Amino acid sequence: MDSVIVAKGLVKKYKKFTLGPVDLEIPKGFSTALIGANGAGKTTLLDTICGIVAPSKGEVTYFGEITDIEEGETKERIGYQAAQGMYPMSWTPYDVAMANKLGFTGFHEERYWELCKKYGVASEGEKKQTLMKMSDGNRIRLCLAAVFARDTELLVLDEPGSNLDPLMRDRLCGQFREYLEEGDGEKTILFSTHNIADMENVTDYAILMYDGAVIESGFVNELCERYVLVSGERATFDKIKRSLLVEDRNMSTCFGFAKAEEKEKLEAAGTVVETPNLQQLCIFLLRYAEQQNS
């Protein structure tokens, strides 16, 4: 697997939170989702990868050879969007355009305004409206328009789907695919989310985080095939309890989550066994991690 980013032993320590040590690879040419609950360390990891904050320990390699993000044109090749936006609230869409035009040689102003129009933000009469007067969703749209208007090889987007309505999230998914297809295997997206349901159809590779640690990762199909969902009667669940990682019991039907290697044993016991989708997998794996740390 060709990797656009490789992190080894990455640690970032704060007073009340520690990220890592994290070892991960971001596959080149795909859309990777960094998934975890609020406070899992997703933003800290992305900020550390992008050089917004310096790591306490560890190393990140970019594009197969670069270990210093400040080296050469590395930052020109990476587009970054922060979860809460990255521009002063006193700025206008016009200011955002001018800043990117001055800061990045690969920024296309005409493309920026086209995307603003496509995203329903910063119309002709709103080009000088301050970000302070915009809704949270419109500020995110503006940031996305700016980052997609640049010539980049890697996009790092922190919670890009947050505060967006369903229609705009659908457009964002389309923009993801368009970006990757234009790159013909040379462009990559890394984005974080705490709710994968809305972005599952554009997720090729997933990394799950819990309490500052990576707990699972892989291409989505392979990842889902490592586990199974189980359903059956309460009496049956009493017999298979030791094979389950997580279980839910109610008055009649019970549900559980197990490793795929337990499939034959679970089916022999009379349960219904299915492969989870990504959303189901994330919920149960995060519950299992929480259970292990309680």
Where in the sequence are the language-model features?
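Conserved ABC transporter NBD signature motif
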Residues: 58-69, 73-74
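The feature captures the beta-strand-to-loop junction immediately N-terminal to the Walker
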Residues: 35-37
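C-terminal coupling/interaction segments
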Residues: 173, 244-246, 250-294
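ABC-family P-loop ATPase nucleotide-binding domains
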Residues: 82-142
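Catalytic Walker B motif of ABC-type/P-loop ATPase nucleotide-binding domains
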Residues: 155-159
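ABC transporter nucleotide-binding domain
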Residues: 171-190, 194-258
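Helix-to-loop junction immediately C-terminal to a conserved catalytic motif
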Residues: 50
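Conserved beta-strand
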Residues: 7-10, 17-27, 58
